[in-house]
UniProtKB/Swiss-Prot annotation:
Molecular-function GO terms, alphabetical: actin binding
Protein name, as recorded: Protein NETWORKED 1B
Tissue specificity of this protein: Expressed in root meristems and at very low levels throughout mature vasculature.
Gene name as annotated: NET1B
GO CC terms in record: membrane; nucleus
Entries under Pfam families matching the protein: KIP1
C-alpha cells in the first residue's frame, strides 16, 4: 500500500514537482547559471597575478568593490534558492498534513515535524524581495492543492500521496546537491574574502611602513646633516690649527735655514782661516805655528759667537711670530671651548626634554590604567543592568527607536565615528560570531544527516523533537525567573556604579588638566631655553666680530713680518698663503654660527611639533579609552545574546507561524539596514584609516624616542672626537714647546757662533795685516785657492737654493702626512662605530628571530583555533541569521557594558555557553598577544629601518670621503708632475683645484637638497620599499668595495708618503727619521691589514644580517596575510552575527513585556543621543584628518614615480663610479710600481748619503790632521798638497751628490752633537800632537847626544887628554839632559849644525893622519902582532873571570824572557831591521866607527832608561874611563883601539835595536791610550753594541800586557849590555837573538794594533774608507818617526844594514 500511495502521490504532484526540478525550472537554471558565472569571474579576479606583491595588493585594492558586489550578488542568489527551498518544504508539509488527515493510517507525522524544523531556520533581510515572490508562488500552489483536495476523490488522493513521496525523495537528493553547492560556494567566498582582507591589510601595513619610513628618513637625514655640519666644523677647526702649526714650523724651519746659512758662512770663514794658516805655516817656524793655530781656533770660536748674536735678532722675530700664532691658537681653543659648552648645554636641555617626555608618557600610562580600572568597574555594574527582559522591552520599541535613529543618522552623518571606536569591539564580536557560525555549520551537517535518514527515523525524530521542545520551554521559564531576580540586583547596583563613574571621570579630568598645565610649563621652559640659545648665538657673533678685528690686526702685523722676512731673504708668498687660510677660517666660523642658528630654530620647531603630538596623543588616548569601554560592553552583550539564542531555540518551532505577519515590517527595516550597512562600510573604512593614523602616531612617538637616543649616542661620539681633537691639540702644543726649547738652544748656539765668527774675522784682519808683505810671494797660491773658493761658493749658493725649495716641499709633505693621519684616525672611529652598530644589529636580529618563532607558534595555535571556530560557525550560521538585526539595534540602544564576572552566575544548564565563552576569552587573549607581538615586530622593523637609513647616511659620508680622497689623489698626482715648475704654475693649479672643489661642493649641496626633497615626498608602498632595500644592499656592496679600494688607495698613499719621507731623509741625511718613517709605514700597513680584516668581517656580518632580515620580512608578510585572512573571516562572521541578532531581537520583541522596558529605554536613548552628539564632533575632526591623509597618500603615490626615476639615475651614477674606481685601481697599480722603484732608489741614495756623510766627517778630521802635520814638519806640505787634490776631487763628487739630494736641513740636536764631536776630536788631536812633540824631544836630545859622541870620538882621534875630554863630555851630556825640554828642540837642532861641521873636519884630518900612519907602520907589524898575542891571554883570563859573573845573569834574563813570552805573539814575519853581520867587516871599517858607536851607546842608554838617566850616564862614563886606563896600563894603543872598536860597534848595534824597539813600544802605548779614550767616549754615547766593546777591550788588554812584557825584557837587556860592556861573542849572540825576537813580537803587535784600529773605525763609521784613512794616519805617524829616527837605517838595511845614513855617506866618500 505504501508503494501504491507513493506512486499515486508522485503522479498527482508531478506537475508541481516538475516546476521545481532545476532541469524544468527556468528560474532555478538562471540562478544557478548566474551563480556559476559570478564564481568564475571572482576566481579570475583573485587568480590574476602581478609582477610584485605591492602591485598585486594595489590590484586587489582596486578590484575590491567589484569583488564585494559579486559576493553580495552571489549571496543573494544563494539566499533566494534557500528561501525557495524553504517554501517548497512548507508547502510539502501542508500537503502532507492534508494527506495525513485524509489517510492517517498510510502517512506518518515525521514529514511534518521535519519540514517544520527545517522551515524554522531563519534567513536574512537582504533577500526579502525573493521571499515575497516565493511566498506568493507558494500561496498560489497551496490554494491549488486545496482545490484539488476538495474536488478530488479518495483514489486521486492515493495517487497524489504516492507522487508526493516520490517527489520527497527527489527533493531530498536535490537538497543534498544544493547543500553541497552551497558549501562549495561558501568556501570559495571565504577564500576570496580572506585574500581580499590579506590584500587590504598588506596595503595598510605598507602604507604604515612607508609613512614611518618617510618620517624616520626625514628625521635621520636632518640629524645627519646637522651632525655632518658639526663634524665638518670640528675638522675644519682642527685642520686650521694644524695649518697654523705648520706655518709656525715653516717659520722655524726658515730660521733653521738662516742659521744653516750662517753656519755655511762660518765654514767659509774657517776655510779662509785654514788657507791663511797654511800660508803662515810656510813662513813661520814650528813653535810659532803651533801657538798661532791655537790662538786662531780661539778667535774662530769668538767670531762664531758674534755671528750667532747677529742671528739672535732674526730668531727673536721668528719667536714673535710663534707667539702670535700661539695667541691665535689660544683664541681658537677658547672658541672651541665655548662651542663645546654650548653643545653640552644643548645636550643637557635635550636630556631634560626627554625626561619630561618620559614623565608625560608615564603619567599618560597611569591615566590609561586608571581609566581602564574605572571602565572595568563600570562594566561590572552595567553587566548586571542588561537583562533579557530589558532587551525584550527594547524589541517592542524597536520600530520607534529605528525611526529616531534614522532621523538622527540623516541629520547627523557624524554617527559614523561611533563605529570607529567600536572597531576593536567588532573584532571580538567577530570571534564570537565565528564560534557561533561554526556551531551553526555543525548543526547544518547534522540536519543533512537527519534528512538522509528521514524515512527510516521519522517517528523517532518526532519524539526527540517533542522532548526537546518541552525541555526548551522549561529552560525559557527558568530564564524568565532568573531575569526577574537579576532586575532587582541590577537596579540596586546601577546607581552606585553611575556615581563611581562620575567620580572617576572627574578625577581623571583633573589629572589630565594637571598634565596639560605641566606640559605648558615645560613648553615655556623650552621657549626660554631657546631664547637663551639665541642670546648665546648673538654673543658668539659678537665674539666672531672681535676675532675678525684681531685677524685684521694680525694681518697687518703679518704684512710687516712679510716685509721683514723679505728683507732677510725668505719668500713672502708662503706667508700670504697662510693669510688666505686665515680668511677662509673666519668665513668658516661665520658659517658655523649660521648653522647653529638654524639648529636652534629647528629645535624650537621640533618642540612645537612635540607639543602638538602630545595633545593629539592625549585626544587619541581618550578615544581609545571610550572604544575599550564600548568593546567590553559589546562583548557582554554578545554573551547575553548567545545565551538567549540557546534558550529561544526551543521556541522557534512555535514562532515560525507568526513570522509571516512580521515580514511586512521587516521589508521596511531591511531597506533601512541596507542604508545603514553602506554607511557602516564607509565608517569601517574611516575607522581603519583612523586606526592606521593611531598606529602611525604611536610609531612616530617611538621613532622620536629612538631618534633621541640616536642623537644622544651621536653627541657622545662627537664629544669623544672633540676630546681626542683637544688631546691632539695638547700634543701639538707640547711639540711647539719642544720646538721652542730647541729654538732657544739654537739661539744660544747661534750667539756662540756669532762670537766665534767675529773673533775669526778679527783674527783674519790681523793676519791680513801681518801677511801683507808676504802676499806677493804667495799670489799664485792665493789665486788658485780663490778660484776654488768661488766655485765652492757658487755650488754652496746653488745648494742652498735647492735646500730651501726642498725644505718647503718637505714641510708640505709633512702637513699632508698629518692630515692623512687625522683621516686615518677618523676612519678608525667610523669603523669602531660600524662594528658596534653591526653588533647591535646582530642582537636585534636574534631578538627578531626569537619573536618570529614565538609568533609562528602563536599563529599556528590561532589557525587551529580558527579552524575549529569556523566549523562551529558553519553550524550556527543558519540559527544566527534571525538574530543579527535585533542584536545590532540592542547594541545601538543599550550602549552599556557588561562585566566578565557574570559568568560565575550562569546555571548548570548553560555549561556549553560558558565553555564557548571561555574559548572566546582564550582566543581574545591569544589575539591580543598576537597583536602585541605584531606591534613589537612593527616597532623593531621601524628600528631596523632607522638603522638602514643610518647606514645609508654612512654610505653617503663614505662617498663624500671617497670624493675628497679622489681630489687629494688628483692634486698629488698633479703636484708630482709639477714639482719642477715655477710658483706661478702651482698657484694657478691651486686656483683651478679650488674652483673644482667649489663646484663639487655646490653639486653636493644640490644633490643633498634633491635628496631631502625626495625624502619628503617618499612613499610608504612596498614597491618603493623593496626597491630601496635592493638599492641599499647594492650601495652597501659598493661601499664595501669602495672601502676596500680606499684601503688599497691608503696603502698606496702610505707608500707614496714613505717614498717622499725617504727622499727627504736622503736630502737631510737624517738616519733617525728614516727609521721612524719606516716604522711608521710598518705600523700603518698593520693597521690597514687590520682594517681590511674588520671590513671583511663586517661584510660577512652584513650579509648574514641581510639574509636574516629578508627571512624575517618574508615571515612577517606571511603572518600579515594570515592575520588579514582571519580578520576578514571575523568581519564576515560579524555581519552574519548582526543579521542573526536582528532576527532574534524581533522574536524577543514579541515574547517580552513591552510597556515596562519602553519607558526605561527611552531615558537611556536620550543619554545615548547626548553621547552621540559628543562623539559626532570628534568624528568630524577625524574625518577631516582622514581626508588629509588620503590627499597625502595620493601625493606619496605621485612621488613614487619620481623616486623610481631617481633610483635609476642613482644606479647609472653607481656604474660610473665603478668605472672611475677601476681607473683609480689602475692608477694605484702604476703608482705602486713607481713606489717600488723609488724605494729601491731611496735605499741606494740612503746608502750613498751615509757614505758621503761619513766621508765628510773623515775629510773634516783629515783637514785638522794635515794642518797639524804641515805646521810641525816640512815634508807634510807635500802630503797636504796631495790631500788637497783628493779633497778637491771629493768636493766635486760631493757637489754632484748634493744636486741629487733633496734637503740638507740638519736639526739642532745633530748640530750640537757634531760640534761636540769636533771639539772632542780637536782635543784628541791636540793631545796626539802633544804626545808626538813629547816623542820628538827625546829623539832630538838623542841626536844631540850622538853628535856629541861623534865630537868626543873625533877629539879622541885628535889625541885630546882623556880626563879633560871626559869632563867636557860629561858636562855637555848633563847640559843636553837638562836642556832637552819640549820647547828647546829647535834650538838644539840649530846648535847641532856647527858641531857636525867640526866633526866632518876632524874626520878629514883623521883620515889623512891614518893613511900616513899606515904607511909608516909597515915595518912595525910584526912587533905589533906580538904585542897583541901577549895581550890576548890576558884578555882571555879577564874574559874567563868575567864569564862566571855574566852567565848567571844571562840565565836569569833568559828564564825571565821565556816566562814572559806569549806564544800568540810569535809570528814568522820579516824583521823591521836587518840581521847584523857580526864581525865580517874589515878592520878598517871597525877602526873608522868604534868611536862613533861608543858615543851612540851612551845616547841609546840615556834614551832607553829615561827614568834613570843619571845612572846610565855614569855607567857609560865608567866604561869610557875604564878603556883609557887599560890603554895606559898595557901601552898597546892601536891594537886595543881596534879590539875596543869592534866590541863597541857590536854593542852599539844591539843598543840601537833595543832603542828602536823601545820607541815602537812607546808608540804602541800611545795608540793604546788613544783607543781606550775613544772607546770610553763611544761607550758613553752608546754607539757600539756590548759584544763589540767586549771584544775590542779584551784585545786591547792583551796588547797592553804584551807591551808591558816587551818593555820589561827590553829594559833588562839594555841593563845587561850596559853592565857587561866587554862581553864576548856567545853572550852577545844571545842578546842579539833576544832583541831580534822582541822586534818581531813588536811588529806583530803593530799589525794587531792596526787591525784593532780598523775594527774600531768600522764600528764608528761603518765604512772601509774610514779604516783606510785611519790606517794612513797611523802609518804617516810611524813613517815620520822612522824618517826622523831610523830612515837611514831602512836604506842601510838594504845595503848591509848600516847604522846611520850620514855616516854611511861618509864611508862612501872615503
Amino acid at each position: 500500500m505504501a508503494s501504491l500511495s507513493q506512486s499515486e502521490s508522485g503522479r498527482l504532484y508531478s506537475w508541481w514537482w516538475d516546476s521545481h526540478i532545476p532541469k524544468n525550472s527556468k528560474w532555478i537554471q538562471d540562478n544557478l547559471a548566474d551563480m556559476d558565472s559570478k564564481v568564475k569571474t571572482m576566481i579570475k579576479l583573485i587568480e590574476a597575478d602581478a609582477d610584485s606583491f605591492a602591485r598585486r595588493a594595489d590590484m586587489y585594492f582596486k578590484k575590491r568593490p567589484e569583488l564585494m558586489k559579486l559576493v553580495e550578488e552571489l549571496y543573494r542568489a544563494y539566499r533566494a534558492l534557500a528561501e525557495r527551498y524553504d517554501h517548497t518544504t512548507v508547502e510539502l508539509r501542508r500537503a502532507h498534513k492534508v494527506m495525513v488527515e485524509a489517510f492517517p493510517n498510510q502517512m506518518s507525522f515525521d514529514m511534518i515535524e521535519d519540514s517544520a524544523s527545517s522551515s524554522s531556520e531563519p534567513r536574512t533581510e537582504a533577500d526579502t524581495e525573493a521571499l515575497q515572490k516565493d511566498g506568493t508562488k507558494s500561496k498560489r500552489s497551496f490554494s491549488q492543492m486545496n482545490k484539488l483536495d476538495g474536488t478530488s476523490d479518495s483514489h486521486e488522493a492515493d495517487s497524489e500521496v504516492e507522487t508526493l513521496k516520490r517527489t520527497l525523495l527527489e527533493l531530498q537528493t536535490e537538497k543534498e546537491a544544493l547543500n553541497l553547492q552551497y558549501q562549495l560556494i561558501l568556501s570559495k567566498v571565504s577564500r576570496f574574502e580572506k585574500e581580499l582582507n590579506d590584500a587590504q591589510k598588506d596595503v595598510k601595513g605598507f602604507d604604515e611602513r612607508a609613512c614611518k619610513a618617510d618620517i624616520e628618513i626625514k628625521i635621520l637625514k636632518e640629524s645627519l646633516a646637522k651632525l655632518e655640519v658639526e663634524r665638518d666644523t670640528g675638522l675644519l677647526q682642527y685642520s686650521q690649527a694644524i695649518e697654523r702649526i705648520a706655518d709656525l714650523e715653516a717659520s722655524i724651519s726658515h730660521g733653521q735655514e738662516y742659521a744653516k746659512g750662517l753656519t755655511n758662512r762660518v765654514s767659509e770663514a774657517e776655510r779662509e782661516a785654514m788657507s791663511l794658516k797654511k800660508e803662515l805655516s810656510r813662513l813661520q817656524s814650528e813653535k810659532e805655528a803651533g801657538l798661532l793655530r791655537y790662538n786662531k781656533s780661539l778667535e774662530l770660536i769668538s767670531s762664531l759667537e758674534k755671528t750667532i748674536r747677529d742671528a739672535e735678532e732674526s730668531v727673536r722675530v721668528f719667536r714673535d711670530q710663534s707667539e702670535q700664532a700661539e695667541t691665535e691658537i689660544k683664541a681658537l681653543k677658547q672658541e672651541l671651548l665655548k662651542l663645546n659648552e654650548v653643545n653640552e648645554d644643548l645636550n643637557v636641555r635635550y636630556q631634560q626634554c626627554l625626561e619630561t617626555i618620559s614623565k608625560l608618557e608615564r603619567e599618560v600610562s597611569h591615566a590609561q590604567d586608571n581609566a581602564k580600572r574605572l571602565s572595568s568597574e563600570v562594566l561590572a555594574g552595567a553587566a548586571k543592568i542588561k537583562t533579557v527582559e530589558e532587551q525584550c522591552a527594547l524589541l517592542e520599541s524597536f520600530n520607534q527607536t529605528m525611526k529616531v535613529e534614522a532621523e538622527n543618522l540623516a541629520h547627523k552623518m557624524s554617527a559614523k565615528d561611533q563605529e570607529l571606536s567600536q572597531k576593536q569591539n567588532e573584532i571580538e564580536k567577530l570571534q564570537a560570531v565565528m564560534q557561533e557560525e561554526q556551531l551553526r555549520f555543525s548543526e547544518l551537517g547534522a540536519s543533512l544527516r537527519n534528512l538522509e535518514s528521514l524515512h527510516s527515523q521519522s517517528q523517532e525524530e518526532q519524539k526527540v523533537l517533542t522532548s526537546e521542545l518541552h525541555s526548551r520551554i522549561q529552560m525559557l521559564r527558568e530564564l524568565e525567573m532568573r531575569n526577574s531576580k537579576l532586575e532587582g540586583d541590577i537596579s540596586s547596583k546601577e546607581e552606585n556604579r553611575n556615581l563611581s563613574e562620575i567620580n572617576d571621570t572627574s578625577i581623571s579630568l583633573e589629572i589630565q588638566k594637571n598634565e596639560i598645565s605641566c606640559l605648558k610649563k615645560m613648553k615655556e621652559k623650552l621657549e626660554e631655553e631657546v631664547a637663551k640659545q639665541m642670546n648665546q648665538s648673538s654673543a658668539l657673533q659678537v665674539e666672531i666680530h672681535c676675532v675678525k678685528g684681531n685677524i685684521d690686526s694680525m694681518n697687518r702685523r703679518y704684512q710687516k713680518l712679510i716685509d721683514q722676512v723679505s728683507l732677510t731673504g725668505f719668500d713672502p708668498e708662503s706667508l700670504s698663503y697662510s693669510v688666505k687660510k686665515l680668511q677662509d677660517e673666519n668665513s668658516k666660523l661665520v658659517e658655523l654660527c649660521t648653522n647653529q642658528r638654524d639648529e636652534n630654530n629647528a629645535v624650537t620647531g621640533k618642540l612645537c611639533e612635540m607639543d602638538s603630538i602630545l595633545k593629539r596623543n592625549a585626544d587619541l588616548e581618550k578615544l581609545l579609552l571610550e572604544s575599550n569601554t564600548k568593546l567590553d560592553g559589546s562583548r557582554e552583550k554578545a554573551k547575553d545574546l548567545i545565551e538567549r539564542c540557546e534558550s529561544l531555540r526551543g521556541e522557534k518551532s512555535e514562532l515560525a507561524a507568526e513570522r509571516a505577519n512580521l515580514v511586512s515590517q521587516l521589508q521596511i527595516m531591511t531597506a533601512n539596514m541596507q542604508t545603514l550597512l553602506e554607511k557602516n562600510s564607509v565608517l569601517e573604512k574611516s575607522l581603519s584609516c583612523a586606526n592606521i593614523e593611531l598606529e602611525s602616531l604611536r610609531d612616530k612617538s617611538k621613532c622620536f624616542d629612538d631618534f633621541f637616543q640616536f642623537l644622544k649616542n651621536d653627541k657622545s661620539e662627537l664629544m669623544k672626537e672633540r676630546e681626542s681633537l683637544v688631546s691632539q691639540l695638547c700634543k701639538v702644543e707640547e711639540k711647539l714647546g719642544v720646538l721652542e726649547k730647541k729654538y732657544t738652544e739654537l739661539e744660544v748656539r747661534y750667539t756662540d757662533l756669532q762670537r766665534d765668527n767675529k773673533l775669526k774675522s778679527h783674527q783674519v784682519e790681523e793676519l791680513q795685516v801681518s801677511l801683507a808683505a808676504e802676499k806677493q810671494e804667495s799670489a799664485n797660491y792665493k789665486r788658485s785657492t780663490e778660484s776654488r773658493l768661488a766655485d765652492l761658493q757658487k755650488n754652496v749658493s746653488f745648494l742652498r737654493e735647492e735646500c730651501r725649495s726642498r725644505k718647503r716641499e718637505y714641510e708640505d709633505e709633512l702637513d699632508r702626512v698629518v692630515n692623512k693621519q687625522v683621516e686615518i684616525f677618523i676612519l678608525q672611529k667610523l669603523i669602531e662605530d660600524l662594528e658596534q652598530k653591526n653588533f647591535s644589529l646582530l642582537i636585534e636580529c636574534q631578538k627578531h628571530v626569537e619573536a618570529s618563532e614565538f609568533s609562528e607558534k602563536l599563529i599556528a595555535e590561532l589557525e587551529s583555533e580558527n579552524l575549529e571556530q569556523q566549523m562551529e560557525a558553519e553550524i550556527f550560521l543558519d540559527e544566527i541569521d534571525s538574530l543579527r538585526g535585533a542584536i545590532y539595534q540592542v547594541i545601538k540602544a543599550l550602549q552599556v557594558e557588561a562585566d566578565c564576572k557574570t559568568e560565575q552566575k550562569i546555571t548548570k544548564d548553560q555549561i556549553s555557553v560558558s565553555r564557548a565563552l571561555g574559548e572566546i576569552d582564550s582566543l581574545k587573549g591569544s589575539l591580543s598577544s598576537a597583536e602585541y607581538e605584531m606591534h613589537r615586530l612593527v616597532v623593531e622593523n621601524s628600528v631596523l629601518l632607522s638603522l638602514l637609513g643610518q647606514f645609508q647616511s654612512d654610505g653617503l659620508v663614505l662617498e663624500s670621503e671617497k670624493n675628497i680622497l679622489e681630489k687629494d689623489l688628483k692634486t698629488k698626482i698633479h703636484q708630482c708632475g709639477m714639482l719642477e715648475k715655477d710658483k706661478q704654475d702651482l698657484q694657478e693649479a691651486n686656483r683651478l683645484l679650488k674652483s673644482k672643489l667649489i663646484k663639487r661642493e655646490q653639486q653636493e649641496q644640490k644633490l643633498r637638497a634633491e635628496l631631502k626633497f625626495e625624502n619628503l615626498k617618499f612613499e610608504s608602498l612596498h614597491d618603493s620599499y623593496m626597491v630601496l632595500q635592493q638599492d641599499y644592499s647594492y650601495t652597501l656592496n659598493d661601499n664595501k668595495t669602495l672601502l676596500l679600494k680606499f684601503s688599497e688607495f691608503k696603502d698606496g698613499m702610505h707608500v707614496v708618503e714613505e717614498e717622499n719621507d725617504a727622499i727627504l731623509q736622503e736630502a737631510v741625511a737624517l738616519s733617525n727619521t728614516c727609521v721612524v718613517y719606516r716604522s711608521f709605514g710598518s705600523e700603518m700597513a698593520e693597521e690597514v691589514e687590520d682594517f681590511v680584516e674588520t671590513v671583511s668581517s663586517l661584510r660577512e656580518i652584513s650579509t648574514g644580517l641581510k639574509r636574516k632580515v629578508e627571512t624575517l620580512e618574508k615571515k612577517l608578510e606571511g603572518k600579515e596575510k594570515e592575520s588579514q585572512g582571519l580578520n576578514k573571516m571575523l568581519e564576515n562572521l560579524q555581519e552574519g552575527l548582526e543579521e542573526d541578532n536582528f532576527l532574534t531581537g524581533l522574536l524577543e520583541h514579541q515574547v517580552s513585556n513591552v510597556d515596562e522596558i519602553l519607558e526605561h529605554r527611552e531615558m537611556e536613548i536620550l543619554e545615548a543621543e547626548h553621547m552621540l552628539k559628543a562623539t559626532n564632533n570628534e568624528n568630524e575632526e577625524l574625518h577631516k584628518e582622514v581626508e588629509e591623509l588620503r590627499k597625502d597618500y595620493e601625493d606619496s603615490r605621485r612621488m613614487r614615480a619620481n623616486l623610481e626615476w631617481q633610483i635609476s639615475e642613482l644606479s647609472d651614477v653607481a656604474g660610473r663610479q665603478e668605472e672611475e674606481i677601476r681607473k683609480l685601481n689602475a692608477l694605484n697599480e702604476n703608482l705602486e710600481s713607481e713606489v717600488q722603484f723609488l724605494n729601491k732608489e731611496i735605499q741606494r741614495q740612503q746608502v750613498r748619503e751615509e757614505y758621503l756623510s761619513l766621508e765628510l766627517q773623515e775629510k773634516s778630521n783629515e783637514i785638522g790632521l794635515w794642518d797639524s802635520a804641515a805646521t810641525s814638519f816640512y815634508f807634510d806640505l807635500q802630503v797636504s798638497a796631495i790631500r788637497e787634490l783628493i779633497l778637491e776631487n771629493k768636493v766635486n763628487e760631493l757637489s754632484g751628490v748634493c744636486e741629487n739630494l733633496n734637503d740638507e736641513v740638519v736639526t739642532k740636536t745633530t748640530k750640537i752633537k757634531q760640534m761636540k764631536e769636533t771639539v772632542g776630536f780637536l782635543e784628541s788631536q791636540v793631545t796626539e800632537l802633544k804626545s808626538q812633540l813629547s816623542a820628538y824631544d827625546p829623539v832630538i836630545a838623542s841626536l844631540a847626544g850622538d853628535v856629541k859622541a861623534l865630537e868626543k870620538s873625533t877629539h879622541a882621534l885628535t889625541k885630546f887628554p882623556a880626563t879633560a875630554y871626559q869632563q867636557r863630555v860629561g858636562n855637555n851630556l848633563e847640559e843636553s839632559g837638562s836642556t832637552t825640554s819640549p820647547c828647546n828642540g829647535i834650538v838644539i837642532l840649530k846648535e847641532i849644525n856647527p858641531s857636525i861641521k867640526t866633526i866632518e873636519q876632524a874626520f878629514v884630518k883623521e883620515k889623512g893622519r891614518l893613511s900616513r900612519q899606515i904607511t909608516r907602520s909597515t915595518s912595525q907589524k910584526r912587533r905589533d902582532r906580538r904585542k897583541i898575542e901577549n895581550i890576548q891571554p890576558d884578555d882571555q883570563v879577564t874574559g874567563e873571570s868575567r864569564q862566571p859573573r855574566l852567565r848567571p845573569e844571562m840565565t836569569e834574563v833568559k828564564n825571565e824572557l821565556l816566562m814572559k813570552d806569549n806564544p800568540r805573539d810569535q809570528v814568522t814575519d820579516s824583521l823591521t831591521y836587518g840581521r847584523s853581520q857580526g864581525t865580517s867587516h874589515g878592520s878598517n871599517d871597525m877602526f873608522e866607527f868604534w868611536d862613533e858607536s861608543a858615543e851612540s851607546e851612551t845616547s841609546v842608554n840615556f834614551l832607553i832608561n829615561s827614568n834613570k838617566p843619571q845612572r846610565s850616564l855614569n855607567s857609560n862614563l865608567r866604561h869610557q874611563s875604564r878603556n883609557p886606563s887599560i890603554e895606559s896600563d898595557k901601552a898597546v894603543g892601536v891594537v886595543d883601539k881596534l879590539e875596543l872598536s869592534r866590541n863597541i860597534e857590536d854593542k852599539a848595534k844591539i843598543l840601537e835595536r833595543l832603542l828602536s824597539d823601545s820607541r815602537r813600544l812607546s808608540s804602541l802605548r800611545i795608540s793604546l791610550t788613544d783607543l781606550k779614550r775613544k772607546l770610553e767616549m763611544n761607550e758613553k754615547q752608546r754607539r757600539f753594541s756590548n759584544a763589540d766593546l767586549v771584544i775590542v777591550k779584551r784585545q786591547l788588554k792583551e796588547m797592553e800586557e804584551a807591551v808591558s812584557q816587551l818593555e820589561n825584557t827590553n829594559e833588562i837587556l839594555s841593563k845587561e849590555i850596559e853592565e857587561t860592556g866587554d862581553a864576548r861573542d856567545i853572550y852577545r849572540k844571545v842578546v842579539v837573538e833576544k832583541s831580534r825576537s822582541g822586534s818581531e813580537k813588536i811588529e806583530q803587535l803593530q799589525n794587531k794594533m792596526q787591525n784593532i784600529e780598523q775594527t774600531v773605525l768600522k764600528l764608528e763609521d761603518g765604512t772601509k774608507s774610514k779604516g783606510r784613512k785611519m790606517f794612513s794616519e797611523t802609518r804617516t805617524v810611524i813613517l815620520l818617526r822612522d824618517i826622523i829616527h831610523k830612515g837611514g837605517k831602512r836604506s842601510a838595511r838594504k845595503k848591509k844594514n848600516r847604522f846611520c845614513g850620514c855616516i854611511r855617506s861618509s864611508t862612501k866618500e872615503e
